[in-house]
Amino acid sequence: MKTTTMSQLRQWKQEKRKFATLTAYDASFAQLFAEQGIQVLLVGDSLGMTLQGFDSTLPVTVADMAYHTRAVRRGAPHCLLLADMPFMSYATPELAFTHAAELMRAGANMVKLEGGSWLCDTIRMLAERAVPVCGHLGLTPQSVNIFGGYKVQGREEVAANQLLQDAIALEQAGAQLLVLECVPVELAQRVTEELTIPVIGIGAGNVTDGQILVMHDALGITGGHTPKFSKNFLAHSAGDIRAAIKLYIEEVEGGIYPAEEHTFQ
């Protein structure tokens, strides 16, 4: 099996070929997802909520992320692997480089940072030092205390224009990929069309180049509140996890998921 690369993702964008991605936190699920056809995985700091039981991602440490990144890499050696940089691990460019190096040594192909144009100096520094970067705009869970909860972002014109400008700035600084979370579908389309780098959506409609879900949401095993944008693919697959992942891939690639019911206006 060939290793998935960023060059492939850029080619898929040019070809308008949509792709499905998932979070993974251990070797077993990573291997299972890869065997069903998932080619891009994210070791998300969402593990703070899904695995550790916290009510936010803020308590997650770089050591936590490195541990799970190593596990996922062993399970899916050929996937393009992203790893979240947790809260306050990239407060300065120097700190970001130190922690990004740790995650890269653990097996990540790329690190993901949450934030707008204030991150440009950090992204530029990382890119110059051969650390590939994925940006993250819209609802950025590490900023939950500022947002006052997990709310849709970019609904007002001023906020939408700012998000678009931030996306452009991140790309110009050297970001190779962008995650766009919980924004109106019209804004997601503007961002996706404006950028030359691939855009992965979560709660951003079916107009982005790729889609990502937290694995627990895709399998319907999330406790408590279920996000509007999620779909329980396991429930549509007679309880067969492998069939559920294949269905998720098929619906993303076919533009079926996310449907209007999963989309914010």
Swiss-Prot record:
Family: Belongs to the PanB family.
Residue numbers binding 3-methyl-2-oxobutanoate: D45, S46, D84, K112
Reactions mediated catalytically: 3-methyl-2-oxobutanoate + (6R)-5,10-methylene-5,6,7,8-tetrahydrofolate + H2O = 2-dehydropantoate + (6S)-5,6,7,8-tetrahydrofolate
UniProt cross-references to SUPFAM superfamilies, sorted A to Z: Phosphoenolpyruvate/pyruvate domain
Keywords: Cytoplasm, Magnesium, Metal-binding, Pantothenate biosynthesis, Transferase
Source taxonomy: Bacteria, Pseudomonadati, Pseudomonadota, Gammaproteobacteria, Enterobacterales
Top-level taxon: Bacteria
Role, per record: Catalyzes the reversible reaction in which hydroxymethyl group from 5,10-methylenetetrahydrofolate is transferred onto alpha-ketoisovalerate to form ketopantoate.
One Gene Ontology CC term in the entry: cytoplasm
Residues that hold Mg(2+) according to the record: D45, D84, E114
Subcellular location: Cytoplasm
Protein known as: 3-methyl-2-oxobutanoate hydroxymethyltransferase
Main location as per UniProt: cytoplasm
Molecular function terms from GO: 3-methyl-2-oxobutanoate hydroxymethyltransferase activity; magnesium ion binding
GO biological process: one example: pantothenate biosynthetic process
Family annotation (Pfam families): Pantoate_transf
Cofactor note: Binds 1 Mg(2+) ion per subunit.
Subunit structure: Homodecamer; pentamer of dimers.
EC numbers on record: 2.1.2.11
Gene: panB
Listed InterPro entries: Pantoate_hydroxy_MeTrfase, Pyrv/PenolPyrv_kinase-like_dom, Pyrv_kinase-like_dom_sf
Protein's pathway: Cofactor biosynthesis; (R)-pantothenate biosynthesis; (R)-pantoate from 3-methyl-2-oxobutanoate: step 1/2
Enzyme active site: E181 (proton acceptor)
Cofactor: Mg(2+)
